[in-house]
Each structure stands twice: as structure tokens, then as C-alpha cells.
Amino acid sequence: MMKKCILGLVAGLTLGANIAMAAENIYPISREMGSGTRGAFTEIFGIQKELKGKKIDATTTKAEVTNSTGVMMTTVANSKNAIGYISLGSLNDTVKAISVEGVMPSVENINNKSYKISRPFNVVIKKSNPLIEDFLAYSINAKAIIEKSGYIATKTKKFVSKKPKGKLVIAGSSSITPLMEKLVESYKSVNPNVVIEIQQSDSTTGVNVVVEGIADIGMVSREVKEAELKRGISVRVLAIDGLAIIVNKANPITNITKDSVYKIFTGEMTTWDQVK
């Protein structure tokens, strides 16, 4: 009898611990305003509200704001109850990606359209020149580099550089920056006559500095807005990227519904025991 009571007590304590953990507060982590990743995320999951006929971001003010992909991942990796979102190509083993509606984020699942949470990696320019055209032609058709980095290439034409001389300044999205760094390094091996500077910030800044003539190429990790196009820029798709929902590796959750993501990031769902 004593043994049964002890076992029952241990089981009860274990169950209680699990319930307590499951009911812990959710710690939503967001990207900053102006981030293309945030823009794509809020649009895909409908985390928006109407204001004077326009849809605006409705992310809860209780979410912690991070200013880059790297900071997002570090924050989630260091908090057991955190949940955030990143570029699929940036995913590493410091955090855990979870499935959405039962489908894991992967290049294969984006290609077969079972995982629908994806967005374009765009580049924008205002003024063109032979160096810009040569570099973009190389980058957009760099299928091996794009796919090895975890993204989906959209074009595969054969490229022969004309090796123009000059300097390029490329600025914008922190999500696109890691891929762009690889493309720049590879392009320099084909065309050693070029100097290329990359300035990491966010997608909106990427558009603004191109419009203002500060940068030659802007990196935009979301759809380019109609109002931005009216400022005289043109857009090209560099690659397709998935968005991954990430949690701490100690979190037992493996799947989440789109509705739960919406409710977490609008502040309607605040504890893990509510998550479906």
C-alpha cells in the first residue's frame, strides 16, 4: 500500500509538472517594423487590421522586437517559451522549426506546394548600368548557390560575364544578406574587376536607399508595394524562400495551426496549453 501511495504521489507530481509547463506564458518574438520577413509573415497569417481603408500590422505590443534574423534566433534559443519566425534558409540547429498544419517547412514541400508559407526574395534597382545587369544576371541564374543555401531558384540560364569594372553598393534585408554574401563572393571569382559593399538593414531601408541613390541594389524579402514601385524602382525575383516558425529546442511542441499562430501574434493566445 505504501509503495502504491508513493508511486501515485510521484505520478501526480510528474503530471502536475507537465501541466504547469504546458500552461506557461508564450513569449512571442517579432521582427522590427520595416522588416520584409515581418511584412511577409503578417500578410501570410493575416496578422493585420483595417485602418482608414488600409491593412496595417496588428502584431501584439507584448511581442519582443528583434532587429535581425540572427538576433531573432538567439532570442528564441535562449528562452524556453519563445516562438518566432525566420527565413527557412537561415535555419540552423540552435532552434527548432515546427510544422504548420502538419507540414514541415522544406524546399521540397514548397516546391510541391504542400507548404504554402513562402515569399519572394526580391532585388530592386532604380538606375541600371552594365555592372548592375551583369551581377544580377549572374545572381538570379546561380541555381547551385541558391539551392545549396536552402532557397528555390527561379531561373537557370547560362551566364557569361562581360566583366565590367566598378563598384556596387547592395543594401537591405538581413534575411537576404547571407545568400547575397555567397553570391557576391562567387561573382568576384568570375569578375575580379568589381568592388561590392553589402549593407545589412531591412527591406524598407533597402528600397529607400535605392530611391535616394545611396545604394545600387536593394534587398527586399517580401512583395514590393505598389507605392514603392511608383517611386521609380523596378523589381526582380532573386529566389523563393520559405518562412519557418521556430521555438526553443526544449519546447515539446512539434506542430501548430495557422489560427494559433495568428492568435499568438495578435495577443489572443497567451499560454502554451491553448496552442493547437
Placement of each model-derived feature along the sequence:
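Exported/periplasmic ABC-transporter solute-binding proteins
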Residues: 21-276
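Positively charged n-region of N-terminal signal peptides that target proteins for export
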Residues: 1-5
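Bacterial N-terminal signal peptides
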Residues: 8-17
